[in-house]
Amino acid sequence: MELYLDTANVAEVERLARIFPIAGVTTNPSIVAASKESIWDVLPRLQNAIGEEGTLFAQTMSRDAKGMVEEAKRLNNAIPGIVVKIPVTAEGLAAINLLKKEGIVTLGTAVYSASQGLLAALAGAKYVAPYVNRVDAQGGDGIRMVQELQTLLEHHAPDSMVLAASFKTPRQALDCLLAGCQAITLPLDVAQQMLNTPAVESAIERFEQDWKNAFGNLNL
């Protein structure tokens, strides 16, 4: 599977890369804006943090296919091999199709339905990113949507994969993996929730106390 961090915080990427076997970093316009850095400054720093083997994702801003393609080429020139995120609108689908012919790898983003995700895959997107928690917030069932999308891609677009996004809890991420997703991207707070395990800390403290009571120190 492929595990990504959804952030533009270079320091946190460097810290968590020591702990998680991350495949790379995903960003979006809101994440980059929150960093207060120019995208052209932060992307090289993120690439350096994840190494040459890591995959970096960045999103276009244009609303029309021509503009999306031009921005995608600019991103690819700046960071060779970057995966360009394209919103799955009508214009976005046209852009994905054109970029496929140009050899630029894309991710169909802002996916709120299985049918929308399937269209992105059929247009040529390597990755499709369903927004799990945002679907839930609108009264839908994000996990069920991911399950449906995963099945559709397996049957009709096997060269594409679900990269599930928009999580508020580790449980949502695990449910996507159980549905067969081969890739997920975690916000920093959800990644940290996976590491914060009070019961484990309590068990370790008990081990240490028992050892110290018996041997007077914490050395092997």
Curated annotation (Swiss-Prot):
Keywords: Carbohydrate metabolism, Cytoplasm, Lyase, Schiff base. Its EC number is 4.1.2.-. The active site is at residue 85. GO terms for molecular function: fructose 6-phosphate aldolase activity. It comes from the Bacteria. One of its GO terms (cellular component) is cytoplasm. It catalyses: beta-D-fructose 6-phosphate = dihydroxyacetone + D-glyceraldehyde 3-phosphate. GO terms for biological process: fructose metabolic process. It is found in: Cytoplasm. It is an enzyme of class 4 (lyase). Homodecamer. Catalyzes the reversible formation of fructose 6-phosphate from dihydroxyacetone and D-glyceraldehyde 3-phosphate via an aldolization reaction. Belongs to the transaldolase family. Type 3A subfamily. PANTHER family: FRUCTOSE-6-PHOSPHATE ALDOLASE 1-RELATED, TRANSALDOLASE. This is Fructose-6-phosphate aldolase. It comes from Salmonella schwarzengrund (strain CVM19633).
